[in-house]
């Protein structure tokens, strides 16, 4: 990315941030995404942005995130998950499968299901309203619930406006095992 100037990201405030998986001095490594997010809570609280994009680092794709954010805003969603239709990649860890309404609203979500054919599988990319993200992180931590898919997403999927965005481009899961 270099300085990020070509993408208007070379600012002292806002722009693009790559955050470490742990943000506390007394913490060597995070065991879950929720712990990692909780460790950067101060950054999330002081940020002025309305939305947060969460993405794992083991999927390669050329996705227009601005389209995902626009769909999130257009749907007045609280959470938008990115998915792809096809066969679940072999090395995807804890795959999620979405049942999606025609308008993109989430109908159901399964974690690590037995699926033999094509389905709507999650790419572990989410756009979330920042204040809601902070609230849900605090709730999960206070209840000692640290599984992102089960405790953060699945447990809350019918309490909030949850939509899905279909990515129709090429993607590949990176696996070093």
Question: Predicted segment positions?
Answer:
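Unchanged
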Residues: 1-177
